[in-house]
Amino acid sequence: MIRVLHLAPEAYPLAKVGGLADVVGALPKALRPLGVEAHVLLPWHGGLEARRVGEVAFAFFGREERAPLGERVEGGVRFLLLGVEGFGRERVYGYPDDAERYLRFALAAKEVARGYDLVHAHDWTAALLALYAPTVYTIHNLAHQGLVDPGLFFSWTGLPWSLFHMEALEFYGRVNLMKGGIVFARRVTTVRPSYAEEIQTPEFGMGLDGVLRRHAGKLRGILNGLDTEVFDPGKDPYLPAPYTREDPSGKARAKEVFRERTGLRPPVLAYVGRLDYQKGLDLVLKALPRLLEMGFRLYVQGVGDGGLQEAFLRAEEENPEGVRFLPAYDEAMARLAYAGAEAVLVPSRFEPCGLVQMIASRYGTPPVARAVGGLKDTVEDGRAGVLFETYHPEGLLYGVLRLFRLGAEEMGLRAMEKDFSWEGPARAYREVYREALG
């Protein structure tokens, strides 16, 4: 039995901003039948309830600090929560002191990691663990790298300045935490095989392509799965009625309730996820007047960029019958949108993997997605959804019109046939763990 500690900023069902939470919440369950005992360690975010099971002592800025350790079991997965300073807040990310908060969390986490064979660290917030423990490091999104002033970094962590050079942590005069994860982890994974190749090129490497090429021997690409027990319209507790591909009658009831909750008459286009320019939301805003003219309605749900949030609030005020915006993480409404909208929009600038298109397909709602990254790999264009190439409002409009011309409802039913389970990816991760420990 391999004992693995997953380290991440978010994990479903405790804290969720985007698809990272779904991955971290689901993978441990899929690993259990394969002989891997995996627990998840998160910051003790504001509002999370857990049973206190101990206290962790660690050093930060040359002083000893102590953090309460909580425990909570959900869906058979053991979640541990670290109550370090700075995390009793509403949001997971988006504060000026995020670098300090997550470094403090990582320094406390390394003490918890002593009881495990291996750490599986996710994205920049957990990358520091690669310097302290045997680590598999997963890059979910290369755009967010965790850049820190070197004076602050070495004062906070107590690590030696000898690590501040091009072959270690230095990146254009700053400390790059993601680079540290890549350099010091025993194995590095990304969220699909072709992404592992793409990020070694200047076009997609976000400045780290040279580092990734130098460490290509330990780089693996594993396509993300989907927790098909959690995302199952046949037994989803958030839906007013169950439905399956064989008997989709309950989907009509979901559409009715979605219309009642939002006040939007069909056809409704839905976006669920982070408010981030990476996600192509500027395209949605620019295309919105034309979409409304054509008779479409728009439902947007998510948190993130303040400018985008203001823009969608204004859009709702100016178009009360055509736009509904929910600036919150609300899993019940997200599931209802996946089931009740006529289409789900995924117009990303770039997308390492993406889970929204998988969830929408599982719920029989076809995605309109840009033909990039993981979207291109997982959306069957013209059969179970629609892809568009050009990053322009006209491209998005073309995709939406093409979907409805080809038959959105029929495509949704075909999308439900696709297998996005974690079974295959979990076996691949077990092999990576064995390599890292070998």
Curated annotation (Swiss-Prot):
Pathway: Glycan biosynthesis; glycogen biosynthesis
Source taxon at top rank: Bacteria
Single annotated GO MF: alpha-1,4-glucan glucosyltransferase (UDP-glucose donor) activity
Top enzyme class: transferase
Listed Pfam families: Glyco_transf_5, Glycos_transf_1
EC number, UniProt record: 2.4.1.21
Catalyzed reaction equations: [(1->4)-alpha-D-glucosyl](n) + ADP-alpha-D-glucose = [(1->4)-alpha-D-glucosyl](n+1) + ADP + H(+)
Gene3D superfamilies in the cross-refs: Glycogen Phosphorylase B (3.40.50.2000)
Gene Ontology BP terms: glycogen biosynthetic process
Keywords of this entry: Glycogen biosynthesis, Glycosyltransferase, Transferase
Residues reported in the UniProt entry to bind ADP-alpha-D-glucose: K16
Family: Belongs to the glycosyltransferase 1 family. Bacterial/plant glycogen synthase subfamily.
NCBIfam families to which the protein is assigned, alphabetical: glgA
Function: Synthesizes alpha-1,4-glucan chains using ADP-glucose.
Protein name (record): Glycogen synthase
